[in-house]
Amino acid sequence: MGKIIDGKKIASEIRNELKEEVKKFTEEGRPPGLSVVLVGDDPASRTYVRMKEKVAKEIGIYSKVDYLSRQTTQDELLDIVDKLNNDEKIDGILVQLPLPDHIDEKAVIEAISPFKDVDGFHPINTGKLFSGMTGQRFEACTPLGIIELLDREGIEIDGKKAVVVGRSNIVGKPVAHLLLERHATVTVCHSHTADLGIETRQADILVVAAGRPKLVKGEMVKEGAAVIDVGTNRVDGHLVGDVDFEAARQRAGYITPVPGGVGPMTIAMLMKNTVKARKYHGV
C-alpha cells in the first residue's frame, strides 16, 4: 500500500518558508509584487485567480488583479502587459489562460518580460530549460511542483527510470526536461505510444498528465513506484485523476491524490517564482 503524498501539507510548508523571505524584502523596502490579469468571466479561471490572490496575501506578496471584460481586444491586453513590464512594483506577471478565441495566446505570452514570466511559459524561459541553461530562468509551476514533491518526500531521481505520460508544453515536456536535468532516464509517452502499459511498468517515477480519467490502471504501475497524478477530470460530479488511485496505490510506493496532490503545489510554486523574480530585480 503506497504512501499518500500530501500536497496540501507540503505546499503549506513552502508558503511558511516564503513568508520569512517576503518579510525580509518588505523590511528592506518593498514586498515582491504579483500581477494577475483575467480576461472574461470563465468561472474556473475566476476561482483560480481568487485562490492565487488569497495565497499571495497570506504570504505577504503585493497582489494586483486586473479583471477585464471578454470584449477586451488583443491590443488593449498587450498594452496592459507592457505597462506591467515597466511597473517597478511588479516582479511577476501572470495572464490567466485560456484567453478568448480572438486573442492570440502566444503573442501575449511572448509580450511578457521573460524576467517577470513567473508562469514559466515565455519562449526564452522554455528555451533555457530545454537547452539546459541554468541561471536566471523560470520553470513552469506544475512541473516545478512535481520535482519539489519528489524532493521533499526523499524520492531519489538520479539514475532512476522516469516515465511521463503526456507531452503538453505546460506539464509533459517541461517536467521531462527537469527530470533529465536531475539525471533520470526519461521516456515520454503520448497518444501514439504503441503499448502504454509496457512503458509505465518500467517506471520508478511515473508522472501522468494526459487529461484522461483513470487512464493508468493498477496493473500498469511498477511495484514500489512513485506515482504523480497531474490529471483533474470531473466525472459524475467528482474530481478524479488520470490514475486509478485505489488500484494503483496497491502497487505504488508513493502516490499523489486528486485533489490534494499536485494542485496545491502549482500555486505554491507560482509564489516561489514571484519571490525569485523579486531577487532578480533587487530593488
Curated annotation (Swiss-Prot):
UniProt keyword annotation of Metal-binding present: no
Residue numbers binding NADP(+): 166-168, 191, 232
Keywords, alphabetical: Amino-acid biosynthesis, Histidine biosynthesis, Hydrolase, Methionine biosynthesis, Multifunctional enzyme, NADP, One-carbon metabolism, Oxidoreductase, Purine biosynthesis
Signal sequence range: none
Gene Ontology CC: cytosol
CDD domains documented for this protein: NAD_bind_m-THF_DH_Cyclohyd (cd01080)
Pathway participation: One-carbon metabolism; tetrahydrofolate interconversion
Catalytic activity annotation: (6R)-5,10-methylene-5,6,7,8-tetrahydrofolate + NADP(+) = (6R)-5,10-methenyltetrahydrofolate + NADPH; (6R)-5,10-methenyltetrahydrofolate + H2O = (6R)-10-formyltetrahydrofolate + H(+)
Pfam families: THF_DHG_CYH (PF00763), THF_DHG_CYH_C (PF02882)
EC number: 1.5.1.5, 3.5.4.9
Domain of life: Bacteria
InterPro entries, sorted: Aminoacid_DH-like_N_sf (IPR046346), NAD(P)-bd_dom_sf (IPR036291), THF_DH/CycHdrlase (IPR000672), THF_DH/CycHdrlase_cat_dom (IPR020630), THF_DH/CycHdrlase_CS (IPR020867), THF_DH/CycHdrlase_NAD-bd_dom (IPR020631)
Coiled-coil region(s): none
Presence of the UniProt keyword Oxidoreductase in the record: yes
GO molecular function: methenyltetrahydrofolate cyclohydrolase activity; methylenetetrahydrofolate dehydrogenase (NADP+) activity
GO biological process entries: L-histidine biosynthetic process; methionine biosynthetic process; purine nucleotide biosynthetic process; tetrahydrofolate interconversion
Record text on subunit structure and interactions: Homodimer.
Biological role: Catalyzes the oxidation of 5,10-methylenetetrahydrofolate to 5,10-methenyltetrahydrofolate and then the hydrolysis of 5,10-methenyltetrahydrofolate to 10-formyltetrahydrofolate.
HAMAP family linked: THF_DHG_CYH (MF_01576)
Family: Belongs to the tetrahydrofolate dehydrogenase/cyclohydrolase family.
Annotated protein name in UniProt: Bifunctional protein FolD
Organism, as annotated: Halothermothrix orenii (strain H 168 / OCM 544 / DSM 9562)
Organism ancestry: Bacteria, Bacillati, Bacillota, Clostridia, Halanaerobiales
